[in-house]
Amino acid sequence: MDPNMSRPPDYSLPPYDDEDLHTPTGYSPAAVRLLTSEEHYDPHPHTYVPPSSPSQDQIPIQTSPTRPASSNSPSASVSPSPSKSTPSPLNPPVEIPPPLFASQTDLNMSSEAGERAFRPEPGQQDNTQANIHNQQEQPSPNPPSYSRSVAESQSLLPNTPVHGGSAAKLQNRNRNSVHVAFADLPTDLPEIPEGISERRRVHKEHQHLGLEANPTVPPRPVSRLKNPNSHDHVPSIRSPRNLNYQPSVRSSRSGSIFDDAPSLGPPGGGSYMSYDTREYGSPQRPWTPSSRMSDFTRSDLSRPPPNHDMYEPSDLNGSPRPGTPSSRYGGSPRRPLPPAPLFHGSRQAVPPFADDATVSIPLHDPMDDDVFGPESDLSDARPHPVDRSSYMSAESQDTLNEGDPDDYDKFEHYGPAPSGAQERRGVRAPQMARKEVQLINGELVLECKIPTILYSFLPRRGEVEFTHMRYTAVTCDPDDFVERGYTLRQTFGKTVRETELFICVTMYNEDEIGFTRTMHAVMKNISHFCSRTRSRTWGETGWQKIVVCIVSDGREKIHPRTLDALAAMGVYQHGIAKNFVNNRAVQAHVYEYTTQVSLDSDLKFKGAEKGIVPCQMIFCLKEKNQRKLNSHRWFFNAFGQALNPNVCILLDVGTRPSGTSLYHLWKAFDTDSNVAGACGEIKAMKGKYGRNLLNPLVASQNFEYKMSNILDKPLESVFGYITVLPGALSAYRYHALQNDETGHGPLSQYFKGETLHGQHADVFTANMYLAEDRILCWELVAKRNERWVLKYVKGCTGETDVPDTVPEFISQRRRWLNGAFFAAVYSLVHFKQIWFTDHTFARKILLHVEFLYQFIQLMFTFFSLANFYLTFYFVAGGLTDPKIDPFGHNIATVIFHILRYSCVLLISTQFILSLGNRPQGSRKLYLASMIIYSIIMMYTTFATFYIIIRQLTSKDDDIKMGDNVFTNMIVSILSTIGMYFIMSMLYLDPWHMITSSAQYFILLPSYICTLQVYAFCNTHDVTWGTKGDNVMKTDLGGAVGKGETVELEMPSEQLDIDSGYDEALRNLRDRLEVPEPPPSDSQLQEDYYKSVRTYLVLTWMIGNGILGMAVSEIYSARGIGDNYYLRFLLWSVAALAVFRAVGSTTFAILNVINMIIEGRVRLTLKAPRWFGGVKDRVSDKMSSVSSNLRN
């Protein structure tokens, strides 16, 4: 097979030689005949079989013998034979020019063969004729067995040019030939008969009758030769079509005789696939020359319809264009151009000429053969191509290397890029339609189908909870949710289930990363519940006992990408929520769905193949921003009351609990019925490879969190009262939270801060509600006639983001410090409530011991500013002694005085910044103050270690327990820093001592001074972003209109104007008193808070100032060994550290005992029988010991 024919040609459009009138032209197998080209006649005729159909009058045509013309003869004469009757199959055949090859009787010849046969070189003319004669003598392997119509016979008329003559195209004498440039014609050219042709007559009749816009052409009569292999006449499946052609100016080539040639199909192995454009007027590829005849029996030989085609120029640099691969299939060498790109804004095709003669387009630049140049009529048809290769074909590496790389930058193949935001392809705006919906108990409740894509990969589809999302528009307060008849899916129908665990996730404006981090961790914890197949509570269907509730504080505050994440899980759908129902404002939008997929923090779907089980979800989107306390009221009073769960877990968006944290948290309630609340360990998120610890602020918080979970939480858990259960990871027993019959209880006190107004809200209560997670702790332990305790669960851990910038860190600690301080004051003032509880006497004694410890801690917190200054004053001032000065020349004295006055000025600056500036507006000043505090702390630490080392290495002083320096310094340091190391090793978690301890001790003065000062100076700020008065007033009316005119109401009569003036004069004369409006509740509340803030700051500042000045003046002239206040301070710190260490050690021992007891009970069950009753007695004894320890 010819390698050039490995694929079909890239052009497949009809030839260009005629329009609706088909004039036969030429006989060249190359399908080309120039009007002015010279060709030689082949004197060897071949036999022609005439048509056999006698139905119509046909004109048999014979070729007259030709004679060679002299060089002076301009052309050869051609004369038609006289008209005769229609020949029968028995008549002698008519001679016609022979085909090129005997084997190509199907007329499917290549252009190369045609050129060699009909345009020989002058020196090879004789040889060519000889070769043709030899080929004629050979028998044809496939004799012609097909019939041909008269029109086809006319297309085979031979021209008889003489050497030096020119071939001429037959023209209709009645047609205007203004567009055709004729050559000199011979005198004996055949003439077309007078009158209109049969084809033209039928065409005009159709136009006259108005049958169709493009009339069809009746099939020509055909004559058949008897062929046993051929079938009967098969109707054509291709509708008759007319041709339109691109207008041009001049032509030097004739049409092709192979327009009607039968097709043998393109060679196999082609991979070409065309494409169509979406715009009218773009070139299409519905027809190829090879598709003109599907078989030899077709009678439908009409032309294809007009396509507004565009072709290559007829000439190539002034010479006829050579043949192309399509010549083998009867195509034209003048190739149609490929279609324009899909989105190219090409104009409509230019209407064709009425003339049937097509001519070429002149090229002004002989080096430029591009018809789409700037001077062409087709310049706007499509973008400028880089080269002549098709857009559908890929360029070879050689072509890419040879081409100019700048050409690709000069031309835009697809036009300019669209500006502005573009809609995604295939995405449309939602089509809204009005529907009548039946209200349920007067409320709007909708069951909405989930998206098709989500439904397609769900493993479970049997229940409505998997296939439909339920939307409820809640128009009432959360306290009235159940009373107004609102229900959840877990309370009706087939999905009625008992809820064991109710998880609340509160969020404000967090992005999708924080939300998916928390939600994916929760779903993995639910999978762990279902994996405990041996549990009596959980198992494969354990997910049916867990409900996750997401409460978002404000519809306009939620992050849009978080909504997208919820929509991807099937929980949320856009366009369903409504603002009001029957003129009642919607307070919250509740979405319910049981999702089976999860999104991790990388926003990748995780499903059942990753162990994810179904999760019952409730998404409550509050209409307004009403603070986190209101979100908890929706959770506890609305949804909790409807579900009545056993345990409620509170999480914040951004917190990532570990894989088994929620199970350990629930297990604490399951094993001890007296536990009302529990919490886990909060860890700072360190980032990949702990890179977040490079930030000193993050490292110091990591150390603080670790030591709190090692020393403080275990100590308080031993006593049974944890001062704060962090809202980021805590759990409560729902039954313990309920109010008593009089309406008083933990929840009523907890939500009291949401309804405080005016002076009735004292500043202590208001600040206490800033740390709302401390409220429930005290109310649960002090609940009347109950013995609830709080527990710390070491096995429950959760990572959370910590502030990494100074302003965010200060703002967070302001709420924490004020809430902790005022909550401690509140619990100490109301400690008598413990006496009315049902706790055991031992538990009450332990609780009073804890109150004493909290009181001491509170006193140290209140005077922490003075204690820091005095510690620095005495320790750093100890180096001013000339005997101890490590630098000599009184350099230590100079450094001490500089740092001393810097410390005093810095503390004063902190008050000024805290009273009048936000941390976000004074970022640099706060950062500078923290750096100076760090320098002071580093010098104080250096002085401490220098004094200790000098004391140990001094030969004059003996080291003994009664020595003041040894007692005050060494014992104090070992009882703090040393205890930190010992307890960290005991809990097998010492790494924070290596990575974060130095940062914490350096930033310790900033914790004491910067954070404490800012917190006390902003006790009046108890708002959580409450909206101001942003409602437009309407009491004065308005001016409404369009354009330059408006409509308004105003006095129109002169009497009204005079009356108003008279009233104004009378008021001035009578001196009427104008009543002053009373101050608003918000103004009274703000004034009250600020006044309390002033009294509190003055009290705190004066107390610390008096303590610092008095102690520094009394002991300024004495040494460290004789400073009794410093001795008291250091020993108090050591005592508190030891107390915390003892409590933490007790907690660790009790945990080990519980583990041993549980293990021993399991072992005794497997003890051999010869133990007798000893086994049972040991088990009972250990169980009683365990119960006593827990109570």
Swiss-Prot record:
Main location: membrane
Transmembrane intervals: 816-836, 855-875, 893-913, 929-949, 968-988, 997-1017, 1095-1115, 1129-1149
Pfam hit, one: Chitin_synth_1N
Any one Gene Ontology BP term: chitin biosynthetic process
GO CC annotation terms, alphabetical: cell septum; plasma membrane
Ranges of Basic and acidic residues composition bias in the record: 36-45
Composition bias type Low complexity, residue spans: 54-88
Keywords associated with the record: Cell membrane, Glycoprotein, Glycosyltransferase, Membrane, Transferase, Transmembrane, Transmembrane helix, Virulence
Biased amino acid composition, Polar residues: 102-111, 124-133, 146-158, 239-255, 285-294, 390-400
Class of the enzyme per the UniProt entry, highest EC level: transferase
Similarity remark: Belongs to the chitin synthase family. Class II subfamily.
Role this protein plays: Polymerizes chitin, a structural polymer of the cell wall and septum, by transferring the sugar moiety of UDP-GlcNAc to the non-reducing end of the growing chitin polymer. Shows additive effects in septum formation with CHS1, CHS3A, CHS4, CHS5, CHS6 and CHS7. Regulates mycelial growth and conidiation. Involved in virulence and mediates mycotoxin deoxinivalenol (DON) biosynthesis via the regulation of the expression of TRI4, TRI5 and TRI6. Plays an important role in the response to cell wall stress.
Designated name of the protein: Chitin synthase 2
